[in-house]
């Protein structure tokens, strides 16, 4: 790559070289795309991983970007524009259906990207239904975010910050 940049290669040539290098990397080690993919009524539930007995990871499509791209990020496959590598869902009903059927799940990790780039209304559709009695087995909801560091305004001055704090209060009080 360095040589391409030094000799003034075209943007297209540099992108092709980067794609070739990226293609040699394993974006989903340990069979994550095959072995940890949950099924509901015999169908694959896109945008989820049931990686550990008690933990489901959910990748909302609205949270598949970040405030900053960290050099150590192991979720890089979410950002390279290859839909075959990306895990993402917009289907709150499938998330809820799967969690209802799997009472061994006590922890939900909402991840991405960074889910806190989403509007609060999107978080509400995924998380507020979990306050219903049929989800009493869900004890922990984690949101994988670096927004407190990179965009603290999300929690204090963004247009929907008050609604976000209200959602968090409901979840904590439950």
Predicted feature residues:
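N-terminal pre-triad scaffold of radical SAM enzymes
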Residues: 41-74
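Short glycine-rich or small-residue beta-strand-to-loop segments that form or flank ligand, phosphate
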Residues: 57-59, 109-112
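Flexible, acidic/Gly-rich N-terminal and inter-domain linker regions that tether
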Residues: 1-51
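Short hydrophobic/aromatic-rich motifs at helix boundaries and adjacent loops
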Residues: 29, 67-68, 98-100
């Amino acid at each position: 790559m360095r040589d391409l940049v030094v000799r003034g290669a075209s943007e297209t040539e540099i992108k092709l070289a980067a794609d070739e290098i990226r293609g040699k990397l394993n974006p989903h080690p340990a069979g994550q795309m095959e072995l940890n993919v949950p099924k509901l009524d015999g169908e694959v539930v896109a945008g989820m991983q049931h990686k550990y007995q008690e933990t489901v990871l959910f990748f909302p499509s609205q949270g598949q970007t970040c405030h900053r791209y960290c050099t150590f990020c192991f979720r890089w496959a979410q950002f390279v524009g290859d839909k075959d590598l990306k895990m993402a869902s917009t289907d709150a009903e499938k998330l809820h259906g799967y969690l209802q059927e799997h009472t061994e799940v006590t922890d939900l990790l909402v991840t991405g990207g960074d889910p806190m780039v989403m509007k609060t209304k999107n978080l509400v559709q995924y998380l507020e239904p979990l306050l219903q009695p049929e989800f009493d087995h869900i004890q922990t909801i984690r949101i994988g975010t670096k927004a407190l560091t990179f965009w603290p305004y999300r929690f204090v001055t963004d247009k929907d910050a008050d609604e976000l704090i209200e959602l968090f209060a409901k979840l904590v009080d439950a």
